[in-house]
Regions:
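Short, acidic, metal-binding catalytic loop of nucleotide-sugar glycosyltransferases
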Residues: 22-30
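GT-A fold catalytic core of metal-dependent nucleotide-sugar glycosyltransferases
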Residues: 68, 83-142, 158, 165
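A glycosyltransferase accessory/donor-loop signature
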Residues: 2, 8, 166-315
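Short, charged/polar "capping" segments at the starts of alpha-helices
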Residues: 39-46
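Short internal beta-strands
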Residues: 32-38, 134
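A short, conserved beta-to-alpha structural element at the edge of catalytic cores
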Residues: 127-152, 242-245, 250, 254-260
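N-proximal low-complexity "stem/linker" segments adjacent to membrane-targeting elements
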Residues: 1-21
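Active-site-proximal specificity loops/subdomain of glycosyltransferases
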Residues: 53-93
Length: 315
């Protein structure tokens, strides 16, 4: 049985439920879910409200992150929260008898059944004695060398940590929490990509390479081109800045995957969120006057949802 792991805060509750719905609807067998959350109470209530939409979940457990007074790098004036570092602490929360975990960011949507390949990767990780499996994001060259030089990496590969298959027994045996926190402090001023930098510094190329079909990145400049998405792609990753739950992101064709699964559990046609009222209003006006509004389903409901979001936001 596959054990999925998520780490988040209240800002990503709906994104989590959307990711979870996409996994549920593309799975043929039951799976378990483990969630490390800063304040899980509201999410637990919401999940109970919609639990009949998640019939393939065998067990779901929520854990409240309890570590206090930790200074996590590169969070000031940033859209990333400390929740991105919660996975360093999995050995404090996840049951000790679990063999393998599949960690997913909450900006990921499942569009085809990943069970077969995930089970195969889990077996290989144990057989080949890797601690994690991940998809390479950067190979060292003239364009990417800054990342490798900044972190003083010896290897030629840097992985994206949005999808990780974890050999949990080996992770525990290596006492990785303490190692990662120590390493985080040592390279504190060099960190640009948060926990991903720390994980790459620790493993330094020593990971099992997994297919990009399990972490199919849709960075901003390519999001409107869906040609690369086919039946082989299982997990798409909205890794760019124009997330599919922003007004700007909805104008991109690839947002349809996220909004489809949001609708399937909530019965609401769009999920829109924003932290900046003025910027969101500008994006909405531009969306209307460039006629993109009429390229989406339920355009008038979209406008109403956007206006409600903008005018109930304090910023």
């Amino acid at each position: 049985m596959i054990n999925y792991l998520f780490c988040l805060d209240e800002n990503y509750n709906n994104q989590f439920l959307t990711t979870l719905k996409s996994i549920n609807d593309n799975s043929k067998i039951k799976f378990n879910v483990y969630v490390i959350h800063e304040k899980p109470e509201k999410l637990e209530v919401n999940f109970e409200k919609y639990k009949d939409k998640y019939l393939n979940i065998d067990k779901i457990k929520f854990f409240q992150f309890k570590e206090q007074n930790l200074d996590f790098p590169n969070l000031k004036n940033n859209h990333i929260s400390k929740a991105t570092y919660f996975r360093f602490f999995i050995e404090d929360y996840i049951p000790k008898d679990i063999e393998t975990l599949v960690y997913l960011d909450c900006d990921i949507v499942c569009i085809n059944n990943p069970e077969g390949i995930l089970n195969s990767i889990s077996a290989r990780i144990y057989d080949e004695k890797f601690t994690i499996g991940a998809a390479t994001e950067y190979i060292k060259n003239e364009h990417t060398k800054e990342v490798f030089e900044r972190l003083e990496l010896k290897s030629q590969n840097y992985f994206n940590a949005g999808v990780m298959v974890i050999n949990y027994q080996q992770w525990k045996n290596q006492k990785l929490k303490n190692k990662l926190l120590t390493l985080m402090d040592q390279i504190y001023d060099k960190i640009d990509f948060w926990d991903q930098d720390v994980l790459n510094k620790n493993f330094d190329g020593n990971y099992l390479e997994i297919s990009n079909y399990l972490n199919f990145s849709l960075v901003s400049e390519f999001k409107d081109n869906l040609e690369g998405i086919n039946r082989k792609v299982m997990l798409i990753h909205y890794s760019g800045s124009s997330k599919p739950w922003t007004i700007r992101g909805v104008g991109l064709k690839s947002s349809q995957y996220f909004q489809h699964f949001y609708y399937k559990f909530s019965n609401v046609p769009y999920f829109i969120t924003t932290n900046y009222k003025k910027g969101a209003m500008y994006d909405l006006i531009k969306f209307i006057f460039t006629m993109k509004l009429f390229s989406i389903k339920n355009p008038w409901q979209f406008i109403l949802i956007c206006l409600k979001t903008i005018f109930t936001n304090e910023k």
